[in-house]
Amino acid sequence: MYEYINGLITNITPSYIVIASRSGVGYRLYSANPYRFEENVESHVYVQQIVRENDISLYGFIDADEKALFNKLLNVSGIGPKSALAILANGDAEGLISAVENDNVAYLTQFPGVGKKTAQQIVLDLKGKLDELASKTGMVDSSSNPEQSQALDDALEALLALGYTAKDVKAVAQIIGRNSDTTDGYIRSALKLLVK
């Protein structure tokens, strides 16, 4: 099983990329949106290997969180790798997580191969199970200051670890993220809002 591959992106097509590893092997990695990668650039691509009866395929992801969301989708009855990639293709992880948490079946049915029954199954299987990914996939606006952004990310992870839901954390993140602060300061501000 592979976790990631470091190498040179040598080819980009509408459905996959080819990455040449340093050992000289070229891997075909199916991707939700291959054009997010740059051709002829050394890249660190997260990989998921799927073994089927007559097929072994590799799927490539821009980061570990996208890979984790892909794997969560694969656990839903009726969702295979191609459907999971189609769902991830628009790059709106925030919208996907929000739709699952808010039972928005209409949003989920907009994806190819996802009908009403499958959308309901996605909500049933994943609701409440995406909390860890919520703060990592863009549900919180990033600051232009990297130190402030890291402090905010650390604070939000701490709140999730304390048992607050992703929905609550997202709500307070929009408020506390407006000001520059330390991790401790963000946590204190968030707790004041959450305890009310």
From Swiss-Prot:
Q: Which GO terms describe its biological process?
A: DNA recombination; DNA repair
Q: What gene codes for this chain?
A: ruvA
Q: Write out the function statement from the record.
A: The RuvA-RuvB-RuvC complex processes Holliday junction (HJ) DNA during genetic recombination and DNA repair, while the RuvA-RuvB complex plays an important role in the rescue of blocked DNA replication forks via replication fork reversal (RFR). RuvA specifically binds to HJ cruciform DNA, conferring on it an open structure. The RuvB hexamer acts as an ATP-dependent pump, pulling dsDNA into and through the RuvAB complex. HJ branch migration allows RuvC to scan DNA until it finds its consensus sequence, where it cleaves and resolves the cruciform DNA.
Keyword Ubl conjugation part of the UniProt annotation: no
State the UniProt keywords alphabetically: Cytoplasm, DNA damage, DNA recombination, DNA repair, DNA-binding
Show the segment(s) annotated as Flexible linker: 142-148
Record note on domains = Has three domains with a flexible linker between the domains II and III and assumes an 'L' shape. Domain III is highly mobile and contacts RuvB.
What assembly does the database describe for this protein?
Homotetramer. Forms an RuvA(8)-RuvB(12)-Holliday junction (HJ) complex. HJ DNA is sandwiched between 2 RuvA tetramers; dsDNA enters through RuvA and exits via RuvB. An RuvB hexamer assembles on each DNA strand where it exits the tetramer. Each RuvB hexamer is contacted by two RuvA subunits (via domain III) on 2 adjacent RuvB subunits; this complex drives branch migration. In the full resolvosome a probable DNA-RuvA(4)-RuvB(12)-RuvC(2) complex forms which resolves the HJ.
**UniProt cross-references to CDD domains, sorted A to Z:** UBA_RuvA_C (cd14332)
* Ranges where the record places region Domain II: 63-141
Q: Where in the cell is it found?
A: Cytoplasm
GO cellular component terms listed in the entry, alphabetical order: cytoplasm; Holliday junction helicase complex; Holliday junction resolvase complex
Main localisation, per the record?
A: cytoplasm
How is this protein named in the record?
A: Holliday junction branch migration complex subunit RuvA
Please name the GO terms that the record assigns under molecular function: ATP binding; four-way junction DNA binding; four-way junction helicase activity
Q: Which Pfam families does the record associate with it? A: HHH_5 (PF14520), RuvA_C (PF07499), RuvA_N (PF01330)
In which family does this protein belong, per the annotation? Belongs to the RuvA family.
Q: Any keyword Chaperone?
A: no
The annotated region (Domain I) lies at 1-62
